[in-house]
Amino acid sequence: MIEADRLISAGVISDEESIDRAIRPKLLAEYVGQPHVREQMEIFIQAAKQRGDALDHVLIFGPPGLGKTTLANIVANEMGVNLRTTSGPVLEKAGDLAAMLTNLEPHDVLFIDEIHRLSPVVEEILYPAMEDYQLDIMIGEGPAARSIKLDLPPFTLIGATTRAGSLTSPLRDRFGIVQRLEFYQVADLEHIVSRSAKCLGLELTPEGAHQLARRSRGTPRITNRLLRRVRDFAEVRADGAINGDVAMKALDMLNVDAEGFDFMDRKLLLAVIDKFMGGPVGLDNLAAAIGEERETIEDVLEPYLIQQGFIQRTPRGRIATNHAYKHFGITREE
């Protein structure tokens, strides 16, 4: 079982990119949720435009699926400049980054996703580029090698990461603007899914939007994915319109419950409750009990359950909370 196999995965599934681009907001006025981020970015962008400067470098971090790429696109659109996109793992050599930097136009935005995965060699190239708009290149080899400096046009680097703690201090300190994206409120997700339905030409009632939003784990990417799957159900089993009843039936069929849990979430929680009397249980024992690798539990399954208060990590192991017992209608034995 891997994260990409799950309907409620916050990661990108292979065929979603083109659809996501079509429904993605283009401007801050269309951007829903994250009010503190929206207000701050509106001020920073307006100030940069008034001065005729490039926007300061921006670091965006937070869980996957919350709109880091969307925000980078919006910044480029609001600034009226080009967006060049790449990712940390793709930039294997210093020359890969140098090629992108030397092709930038003044004030362009360079977006590096998964920036925490940059190699140290590539990261070193970024320091003078971000700070002084200069590129240090080594010419030649051995004793004859020499360094030359190339001037770069003023540009904005936007780095995105799900692991801000993995960034080195020198890189993190060079970002003048740092934005953390939080999980979305249900009301915001209702607005997002209603807008997406309109973009896709779907009939979605407010109650249908609510059912989709409340099961989306606070994540717009999951909301939009569930919308597409519920659309399929509505076209085959109903008249094509998505109301509350159709949405509930479709999501129940898809095995996504009222908390946004799928079968893997429930399997883990019930293992702690039934097999280990609510815990504490060590990670290795829990992994063996549900037939998963410990890394899958730690990196994929647990974070949302902990964030929502269904599981607690303690020095002695994992414990199911009263919230978890209540979810399954199980009375906790004292």
From Swiss-Prot:
Record-given protein name: Holliday junction branch migration complex subunit RuvB
Family: Belongs to the RuvB family.
Cross-referenced Pfam families: AAA_lid_4, RuvB_C, RuvB_N
Residue positions binding Mg(2+): 69
Listed GO MF terms: ATP binding; ATP hydrolysis activity; four-way junction DNA binding; four-way junction helicase activity
List of residues binding DNA: 294, 313, 318
GO biological process, one term: DNA recombination
Head domain (RuvB-H) as annotated region, ranges: 258-334
Oligomer status and interactors: Homohexamer. Forms an RuvA(8)-RuvB(12)-Holliday junction (HJ) complex. HJ DNA is sandwiched between 2 RuvA tetramers; dsDNA enters through RuvA and exits via RuvB. An RuvB hexamer assembles on each DNA strand where it exits the tetramer. Each RuvB hexamer is contacted by two RuvA subunits (via domain III) on 2 adjacent RuvB subunits; this complex drives branch migration. In the full resolvosome a probable DNA-RuvA(4)-RuvB(12)-RuvC(2) complex forms which resolves the HJ.
Record-listed ATP binding positions: 23-24, 65, 68-70, 131-133, 174, 184, 221
Enzyme nomenclature, EC number: 3.6.4.-
Domain of life: Bacteria
Keywords, ordered alphabetically: ATP-binding, Cytoplasm, DNA damage, DNA recombination, DNA repair, DNA-binding, Hydrolase, Nucleotide-binding
Classification via HAMAP family: DNA_HJ_migration_RuvB (MF_00016)
Protein source organism: Yersinia enterocolitica serotype O:8 / biotype 1B (strain NCTC 13174 / 8081)
Residues covered by region (Large ATPase domain (RuvB-L)): 4-184
Gene that this sequence comes from: ruvB
Subcellular location: Cytoplasm
